[in-house]
């Protein structure tokens, strides 16, 4: 199978581009080489090789976490061996597991 070249175009903030290009240059690479390495890593690992830990939970999630931490969260049990449709499962959850 013959490999063919493809091009990608995207928009970015000029300041970010200039700062990134300076770093890339310090490594003795070109932006094209770095972007190709980035895409190859994504394809190889089936993941994005960027630290996404900066993602923060929203207000609702933080409130739910606080509720759990305080011990005031409503709990219920649904038998794992029982089979439910998505609709039945949702009804069970909304009815406190009943």
From Swiss-Prot:
Keywords: Toxin-antitoxin system. InterPro entries: Arc_rbn_hlx_hlx (IPR013321), RelB/DinJ (IPR007337). Pfam families: RelB (PF04221). One of its GO terms (biological process) is DNA-templated transcription. Belongs to the RelB/DinJ antitoxin family. Antitoxin component of a type II toxin-antitoxin (TA) system. Its cognate toxin is YafQ. This is Putative antitoxin RelB. It comes from Haemophilus influenzae (strain ATCC 51907 / DSM 11121 / KW20 / Rd). The gene is relB.
């Amino acid at each position: 199978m013959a490999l063919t070249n493809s091009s990608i175009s995207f928009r970015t903030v000029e300041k970010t581009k200039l700062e990134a290009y300076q770093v890339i240059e310090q490594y003795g690479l070109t932006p094209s080489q770095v972007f190709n390495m980035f895409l190859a890593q994504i394809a190889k690992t089936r993941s994005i090789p960027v630290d996404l830990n900066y993602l923060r939970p929203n207000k609702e999630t933080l409130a739910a976490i606080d509720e759990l931490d305080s011990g005031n969260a409503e709990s219920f049990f649904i038998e794992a061996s029982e089979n439910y449709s998505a609709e039945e499962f949702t009804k069970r959850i909304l009815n406190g597991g009943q």
